[in-house]
Amino acid sequence: TVCTKPPMLSISVRPHRLSYEYIKESMEFVVNMPHSNMTKAVDYCGVKSGRTNDKIKEMGFTMKECRQINASYIDECPVAIECKVKQIIPLGTHDLIIADVLCSHIDESLMDEKGKIHFEEANLINYCHGEYYPMTKKSLGSFGYSVRKKKKKK
């Protein structure tokens, strides 16, 4: 999250990547958030070029049309976020792309009756410095928990 009001996020992409060309041309993109069972497919898609490979077909992904942008998202991903580019900032090896979040697609099994999303149930993965890590733990705390007063028992 870059900003909550309005909702925004950022990604970094190397300018020589095919996905970068698509983003620059359309000024739209989708952030698909895969679960750990998709790690091998995610790695394959990160290594192989879409210029020479039909990665969607090869990985057997099911594509669904987005609601607010002219793109598709991967139905197998428990979370997908539709974005509209606001700004692109060249940094060096990567360009920082800041985007408005237009809408999201979230597996309903991850939401409770109040609409809260339980990301720990999604078994999402994180990529950091060339390694894939599971995100399976519960939250370590929510904003302000260090100073929040404890509720008194009745």
Predicted segment positions?
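Basic, polyanion-binding surface patches
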Residues: 1-154
